[in-house]
């Protein structure tokens, strides 16, 4: 942890320990923080004892070991993207395919936010909140933009666009957005004309 650069990464053990430690501290100091009328973060920074901080780290390490077999489990083995069905309440399943996601919840300062947690019957954490769409736009003589959606454009599990952007989303690999007719050449599956 001393060598951690405080950046998330799929291969980062420190991210795993840091997030699990933070979750543990939230549970341990929530009540006294409210009683002191300060945020949990302020309480941890100003009132938590070294013993409390270390006990929470030991508990976090134990939880990771119990759930994943080793305390030094990389974040990407824990934090996953999974889209199996179009259900609003998703049936997450550790045995089914999923994709590692390097970024964390905005709770931990991540601008690319992926709010994940374990669900009933799972040990891995699956994201259900955060950025569902990310775009950057350059304005000028011509508009230029890059974007990605979480999963894919379609809500139909039978569509090739149901999950086709999941890997790209997890990697932060934004695709070009086509605004102009010449950009659309070779990239159009079908055309729609209102009234026809």
Residue ranges and their predicted role:
Residues 1-196:
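Long, compositionally biased non-active-site segments enriched in small/hydrophobic residues and glycine
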């Amino acid at each position: 942890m001393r060598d951690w650069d405080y950046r998330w990464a799929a291969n980062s053990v420190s991210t795993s320990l840091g997030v699990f430690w933070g979750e543990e501290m939230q549970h341990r100091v929530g009540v006294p923080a409210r009683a002191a009328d300060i945020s949990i973060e302020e309480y941890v920074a100003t009132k938590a004892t070294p013993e409390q901080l270390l006990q929470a780290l030991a508990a976090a390490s134990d939880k990771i070991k119990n759930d994943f077999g080793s305390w030094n489990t990389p974040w990407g083995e824990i934090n996953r993207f999974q889209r199996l069905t179009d259900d609003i309440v998703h049936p997450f399943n550790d045995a089914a395919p999923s994709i590692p996601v390097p970024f964390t919840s905005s709770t931990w300062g991540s601008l690319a936010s992926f709010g994940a947690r374990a669900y009933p019957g799972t040990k891995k954490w699956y994201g259900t909140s955060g950025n569902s769409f990310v775009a950057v736009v350059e304005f000028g003589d011509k508009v230029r933009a890059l974007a990605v959606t979480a999963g894919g454009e379609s809500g139909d599990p039978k569509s090739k666009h149901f999950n086709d952007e999941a890997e790209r989303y997890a990697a932060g690999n934004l695709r070009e957005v086509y605004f102009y007719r010449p950009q659309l050449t070779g990239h159009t599956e079908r055309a729609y004309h209102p009234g026809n």
